[in-house]
Amino acid sequence: MQLSLTQARTWKGLFLLVSCMFLWVYVTATRYDRKSNEEIYDNLLSSSRHIHRVAKKMYKILDSKLTEGVCFRNKNTKMCQTISTHSVKKNEDLLKVIINVSNFWTYPLKMLIPAVLTHLDSDDGMMTRAVELNYGNKVVLEGAKALLSRIQPGIEENNEPDRWSDLRELRSSKKSKHLLAFCKFFYCLRKDTKMVTCYLRALKHGKIKTIC
């Protein structure tokens, strides 16, 4: 039986997502218990830098090829939901910020995959990049939790993050709406992953007073 183009794309997306989930479950189950804090920081920095580069690349592709500069010109795409860091004084405070930021992006990145599959799959490997973002964010989240548990054993986790306010537009069948939603998504993700990378670097080198 020959699959239609839509069916083939759907199966492709499901295969990539399931593969990513199995890899993440295996890696996170074995990664942190045998590693030093420095090794974990190195791993998280690598993952955070990678997802920042991927988000930056996706934003660039979207702005230059799909929206012809609309991303850059539209001020609404640069209004992000931010997390306050004014009370950061200790390592555990900074780790909590990293956890909150990564946790905030967990659901939006999960929903990004079907949205990209529907609207952007044919453009420059966007589907593969969406899966990479989803996986990389989970690596950072679980690693930051592992580090925090070593500093504050038994700490309760925040399992109810705020939801991304533009997910409905991301799924919209109207091209102008979902493209602008993608612009905002990648711009804000790029901004937040840059912040997380900076905080991880500050933690690794013990320079919290000079963070970004």
Curated annotation (Swiss-Prot):
Gene3D superfamilies: 1.20.1250.10. Disulfide bonds join 80-188. CDD domains: prolactin_like (cd10288). Glycans are attached at residue 100. It comes from the Eukaryota. Pfam families: Hormone_1. Expressed exclusively in decidua. The keyword NADP does not apply. The keyword Secreted applies. It is found in: Secreted. GO terms for molecular function: hormone activity. One of its GO terms (cellular component) is extracellular region. Keywords: Disulfide bond, Glycoprotein, Hormone, Secreted, Signal. Belongs to the somatotropin/prolactin family. This is Prolactin-3C1.
